[in-house]
């Protein structure tokens, strides 16, 4: 049977993988990990990565879900050489192959009614038999093709299907366990299992990486590929991702959508690094650059066991990348969160100045944006607990002296601000904390912030001096 290639199949490309999500919802972390493993394996061998949208479920597939999947892939920077291809645009191709299979005796029309099939199932279950089609229509082909019917694949009845799964090892399924699969529905639409086979064939897919929930589909698909005379890809079925309670990961464990992690303030590098380690590793190494992942990744090293999603580990990785990636790069992602929280970044320090200062304390970009508010806009009130502890009458004198020294500064820089704080403490004969704590509360409104010399530098001269005066008046009014 002729191959209809969608693109020139370069004979020099030894590995071509694919990611084939169904657009019935967002791109979840399980799908993202599958995409990542497929992408890494292709890149490891200088191969090609194909993106395919399996949208044959017309009732549940939506353009919004497709857009969300593409957005998630682009955010993760999982680029593809070919695609995205849509199965709904290839129905003519699938039906062409099905018609050829009927002509060659590889498939047949089935006219059995739902009532007959239900009766057959009931009889088989009553006899403790595995429910399966009895091939009633295989030799009854005198019906009109205009009558309602489905098309079934004529599955081999003898022998077994054996394949070497790259993750799970050798798997063998007896053909007696397999049914004559419906490959075209009554309405003329091809079924999922058949579309996948033709797509993998036409697209020259050499390795299929997917979730373990597809294992039962594999022997059926292999038999169809064999019947078509098509090459059999290497299959790799990865285990599920569970929550930290051992149950299948779901919304109750927190975010499961890739874009929700973006909205929650995670960098794509952190999520990619975390996902690659959910089932694969290289010794005790935890931090992997993308280049290292490509160099080291191997499907045969992927664990067969389910992985547990640990948000704390992801946060640790995210904080690492917030601190170590170039501030200019992190700023591109932080800007979205600043805008989302209605913080005008034109009214304060540059994000590249801010990131090194706040990334030590924040676990996510969302937290960092929230913590940065006092750098860009005025706050309405002081932290009440900090006021009771810090804004006592004795704080007025150090704040007043500090204000005087800061006002006299010619150059507003970290070193000069620090010297002004030191001089205030020395001249008043008090500890640095008696200066720093009320200074912090006055300028930030809270009891926690980075070092006050750096904080005041970034807050700016005018804003810092005005807040000091406001705090002095507040203390005077309290006493």
From Swiss-Prot:
It catalyses: tRNA(Glu) + L-glutamate + ATP = L-glutamyl-tRNA(Glu) + AMP + diphosphate. The keyword DNA-binding does not apply. Its EC number is 6.1.1.17. It is found in: Cytoplasm. Its main location: cytoplasm. It is an enzyme of class 6 (ligase). This is Glutamate--tRNA ligase. It comes from Haemophilus ducreyi (strain 35000HP / ATCC 700724).
């Amino acid at each position: 049977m002729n191959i209809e290639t969608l693109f020139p199949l370069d004979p020099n490309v030894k590995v071509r993988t694919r990611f084939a999500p169904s657009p019935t919802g967002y791109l979840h972390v399980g799908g993202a990990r599958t995409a990542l493993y497929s992408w890494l394996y292709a890149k490891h061998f200088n191969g090609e990565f194909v993106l395919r949208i399996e949208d044959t479920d017309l009732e549940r597939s939506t353009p919004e879900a497709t857009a969300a999947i593409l957005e998630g892939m682009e955010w993760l920077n999982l680029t593809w050489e070919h695609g995205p291809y849509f199965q709904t645009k290839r129905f003519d191709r699938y039906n062409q192959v099905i018609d050829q299979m009927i002509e060659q005796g590889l498939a047949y029309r089935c006219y059995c009614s739902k009532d007959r099939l239900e009766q057959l199932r009931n009889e088989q279950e009553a006899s403790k038999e595995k429910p399966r089609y009895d091939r009633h229509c295989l030799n009854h082909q005198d019906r009109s093709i205009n009558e309602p019917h489905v098309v079934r694949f004529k599955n081999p009845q003898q022998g077994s299907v054996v394949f070497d799964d790259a993750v799970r090892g050798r798997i063998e399924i007896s053909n007696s366990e397999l049914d004559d699969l419906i490959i075209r529905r009554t309405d003329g639409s091809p079924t999922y299992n058949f579309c996948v086979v033709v797509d993998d064939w036409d697209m020259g897919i050499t390795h299929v990486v997917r979730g373990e929930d597809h294992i039962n589909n594999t022997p059926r698909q292999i038999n169809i590929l064999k019947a078509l005379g098509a090459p059999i890809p290497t299959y790799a079925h990865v285990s599920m991702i569970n929550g930290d309670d051992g149950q299948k990961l779901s919304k109750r464990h927190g975010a499961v959508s890739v874009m929700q992690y973006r909205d929650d303030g995670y960098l794509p590098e952190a999520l990619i690094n975390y996902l690659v380690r959910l089932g694969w590793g290289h010794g005790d190494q935890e931090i992997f650059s993308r280049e290292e992942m490509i160099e080291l990744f191997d499907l045969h090293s992927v664990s067969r066991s389910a992985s547990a999603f640990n948000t704390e580990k992801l946060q640790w990785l995210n904080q690492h990348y917030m601190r170590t990636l170039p501030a200019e790069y992190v700023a591109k992602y932080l800007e979205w969160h600043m805008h989302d929280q209605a913080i005008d970044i034109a009214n304060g320090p540059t994000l590249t100045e801010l990131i090194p200062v706040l990334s030590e304390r924040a676990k996510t970009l969302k937290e960092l944006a929230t913590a940065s508010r006092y750098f860009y806009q005025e706050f309405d009130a002081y932290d009440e607990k900090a006021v009771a502890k810090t804004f006592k009458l004795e704080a007025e004198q150090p704040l007043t002296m500090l204000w005087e020294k800061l006002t006299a500064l010619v150059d507003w820089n970290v070193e000069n601000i620090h010297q002004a704080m030191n001089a205030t403490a020395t001249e008043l004969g008090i500890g640095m904390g008696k200066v720093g704590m009320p200074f912090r509360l006055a300028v930030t409104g809270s009891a926690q912030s980075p070092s006050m010399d750096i904080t005041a530098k970034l807050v700016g001269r005018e804003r810092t001096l005005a807040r000091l005066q406001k705090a002095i008046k507040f203390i005077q009014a309290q006493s």
